[in-house]
Amino acid sequence: MSDQQNTQQDDQPFFNIQRVYLKDMSLEQPNSPAIFLESEAPSVEVQVNVGASQLQEGIFEVVVTGTVTTKVQDKVAFLVEAHQAGIFDIRNVPVEQLDPLLGIACPTILYPYLRGNIADVITRAGFQAIHLSEINFQALYEQRLQAAMEEAQGAEGGNSGIVMPDGSQARH
């Protein structure tokens, strides 16, 4: 192979999953065993968050955090929090494409693992399985972008002027 072909291959965008792992998981059952005697249907609250950090040049860790809280009336039946992580090798990707890759593609890869781990620990704890629904990470990413833009615009407009000792603002 010629040097020119090697250079062209070295410049090609590269994406590889190095490792997928369960970074952390906790289960709390503060009202067991009495909660097992309750006959009322539980309410379920699910929260999902995504975070990413650069470990070294071209190597990123993405973490999808899922929290499931189930209550019967005002009593917590259980609370599960899991951090499903992955290490991704991402090189030669344009800067404007890196953030969507970390915020959409990587979480989409990790989420099925998170769902499985949460479902497993819930059933092993003695509760009925809760199957987390699919998530559109692109829509979630776009919502976060919109919220960040609105917050930035609000900060620009709301912080102009001088803040007086009584908390009011003097505009100039």
Swiss-Prot record:
The keyword tRNA-binding does not apply. GO terms for biological process: protein folding; protein tetramerization; protein transport. GO terms for cellular component: cytoplasm. Residues 152-172 are annotated as: Disordered. One of its GO terms (molecular function) is unfolded protein binding. Belongs to the SecB family. This is Protein-export protein SecB. It comes from Cupriavidus taiwanensis (strain DSM 17343 / BCRC 17206 / CCUG 44338 / CIP 107171 / LMG 19424 / R1).
